[in-house]
Amino acid sequence: MRFKKFAAIILMSTMIGTMSLSGCGGVNKDAVAITMTSDDKDAIEVTMGYANFAARIQQAGYDSVFASYYGDDYWTNDSYAKDGKNMQESIKDSVLESIETQYLLEKHMSDYGVEITEEDQAAIKKAAEQFMSDNSKAALKEVGATQEYVERYLYLQTVEKRMKAAISATADTNVSDEEAAQRTFSYMKISLTTYTDESGKQQTYSADETTVVKKNADDAAQKAQSDFDGTAQEYSYDVKTYSYGSDEKSEADGGFCDAVIAAANSMTAGQVSGLIEGADCYYIIRLDSEFDADATEKKKESIISDRQDQLYQDVTDGYKDAVKIKVDEDEWAIVNFDNIFTAPPAADNSDSSATAE
């Protein structure tokens, strides 16, 4: 059977194509999958029908990307497990967390003046109707889709997008030059172990070749003092740039070579280093700027984005901490990804679009 995807409202990334028909297992669509309760508010309940649909939509998106590479058993294959959970378990957990977040965000819309207008509702309804009409009854049954579930899915996606924007807008956007300050250097990295041959394949240096590489690197370091770029060209060394600030991670944590950063910190603009020893390599660097204005502005944007993301996470975590969340594990265990979705032929992959920003 074939599913046609549609672009509507936000993130309806249903890369759905064909799959074998076996129905929805034993899912009881009217059973309650998730219950969220608090002392001062009515309980929030999410049905198995909706939760199953949300999970199968996620499955379809993953299948369209990964199934052809990793095989039909990739959902439960322990080779792809992480933190003791296979992919099916991990994605099902993610679906639950997403549903919980979206339902709680819906309850707090008034806190941030967020609304879903009648025009939005009409666009959602139209997109859902198009999706339902584009796909066969058998296909819709397999994914657990109904007009109600598709509308609800798109509605909650829209709520989540607008609430995230509204919450993020309250983050502190004041970032000083001192906090964001970036230094920038250019560098040549000279490997002492491997090189790429003319055919593009990686080869390993012999002991004699390594001796030559080291001698060339030493000569290049001396010449670079007067002509950094010319030396790089002469020895066919690539020149790259790197910007960093006071929050630069250590090399062990994924940052740049510690010895290089230490050298850069001791240099003034225009100064060229000698050979700096790294892990199986040498570096030669030139400090280009002690305060890179462009890089600093980009860093400010990054800091603000991180603050916004953290604030959103803190707010949604707070919503969850304020309620008691119960998942019917027996019902949820029935949802599985045994059948693999495959992408439809290009001619059958049409879109019906609706937007609500």
Segments the model singles out, each with a brief description of its role:
Residues 215-259, 289:
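Peptidyl-prolyl cis-trans isomerase
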Residues 30-69, 103-109, 114, 158-167, ...:
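FKBP-type peptidyl-prolyl cis-trans isomerase
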Residues 26-29, 138-212, 255-357:
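PPIase-associated folding chaperone regions across multiple families
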Residues 4-16:
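Sec-dependent N-terminal signal peptides
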